[in-house]
Amino acid sequence: MSSSETQKMQLYSYSSSSCAWRVRIALHLKGLDFEYKAVDLLKGEHLTPEFLKLNPLGYVPALVHGDIVIADSLAIIMYLEEKFPENPLLPRDLQKRALNYQAANIVASNIQPFQNLAVLNYIEEKLGSDEKLSWANHHIKKGFS
């Protein structure tokens, strides 16, 4: 039995991160026990040597399950769905499943990046705060249309 079979999962998360929300929701819907580890992005805790040793990408959420570390919300959710098939998150019907993947990818690729603090700060630095809001609103509305 691997160490991931017997160890409690740890979720490194920032309370306001929509990416982290997705994983917390999935863990709860699947009824999985995990330990919540707060990472304060505003204080730069994701950039500390300790966190970067665990997760060189410096992203939250990050899920640790035994010797496995996964640092992307959709990858984490896919791992949970495969590893713990009880209480499935996805429908069995292939077409409905594909629509779920489509919605998840639109959020992850087209909407969420414009809610990311690093992206918003960069846009504001280069173009100003009015342009930052304009960019973010444009891409978020487009993703939901």
Swiss-Prot record:
Name the enzyme group at the top EC level: transferase
Sites where the protein binds glutathione: S17, S18, C19, A20, W21, R22, V60, D72, S73, Q112, N116, L117, A118
Q: Which reaction does it catalyse?
A: RX + glutathione = an S-substituted glutathione + a halide anion + H(+)
What's in the keyword line of the UniProt record? Transferase
Task: Give start and end of each GST C-terminal domain.
Answer: 93-145
List the GO terms this entry assigns under cellular component, sorted alphabetically. Answer: cytoplasm
Q: Per its record, what are the GO molecular function terms?
A: glutathione transferase activity; maleylacetoacetate isomerase activity
- EC number per UniProt: 2.5.1.18
Q: Which Pfam families match?
A: GST_N_3 (PF13417)
GO biological process terms, alphabetically, are: glutathione metabolic process; L-phenylalanine catabolic process
> What induces its synthesis?
Accumulates in response to the phytohormone ethylene.
List each copy of the GST N-terminal domain by range. 7-88
Q: What this chain does, per the record? A: Conjugation of reduced glutathione to a wide number of exogenous and endogenous hydrophobic electrophiles.
| Family label | Belongs to the GST superfamily. Zeta family.
Q: What is this protein called?
A: Glutathione S-transferase 2
The species this protein was found in:
Dianthus caryophyllus (Carnation)
- Gene behind the chain: GST2
